[in-house]
Amino acid sequence: MDWFNLRRIALFCFALAFATVSLVADDRPNIVWIIPDDMSANFGCYGETAIETPHVDALAAGGLKFTNAYVTAPVCSTCRSAFITGMYQTTLGTHHMRCNAKLPSFVKPFPILLREAGYYCTNNSKTDYQFSAPRETWDASNGRAHWKNRKAGQPCFAVFNFGGCHESGIAGESKYRSVTANLKPSQRQDPGTLKLPPYYPDTPVVREDWKRNYELITAMDAWAGGLIKQLKADGLYENTIIIFWSDHGVGLPRAKRWLYDSGTRIPL
């Protein structure tokens, strides 16, 4: 038998063996997005000292931290339209807030492509993409959506949104109290001792807002830690790509809706 035919047989056997393995085991990585609303990079891993964020800091220490990550729009749905499609807002026609754009027929939200590749895709539970997402975007998109509901061995793409840090959590008394209800006394902030950004007026109202921002971040870090703990308990952590990011800067003046650093620079 000549070398050419031997090589063809060897390649065929290798391909057959690989195909057989693929049928019994899918070792493609899982992907988990952790997305808090309205959050600047006020974390220990970015040099913040006023609060402790151990779970996000541990992610950064064990992974890849971007120090100059910017979104292409400083407000939620406009930004999210780009993340879910991989295209600029001006390309999609989603650059005007609350415009309810219609996607070009050739554009697919990328979870559809993951589903076509065999992934179980869930969103828990914010969409707000500036357009009506096609029904086939997600296997599940609601407050119960979770990787636990996939088939055995099926790779997953799971999105978890934390709305507690939204600007309404700073401005709204009841929401702020609800989100921060489980904080320990040591995790509370004294508004009188906080260092404000230099562009804010030093008034009691501003200090209270900045205090609430910090405490909401602390609550979010605990929530993120719970997701990571669950991944480990389910034996998925080592084969999961975890991406932590926010849609834009903090929900305060000169941040959210602001086109410069404080509105567009995010933790990633």
Model-inferred region functions:
Residues 2-4, 23-268:
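Formylglycine-dependent sulfatase
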Residues 9-20:
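Bacterial N-terminal signal peptides
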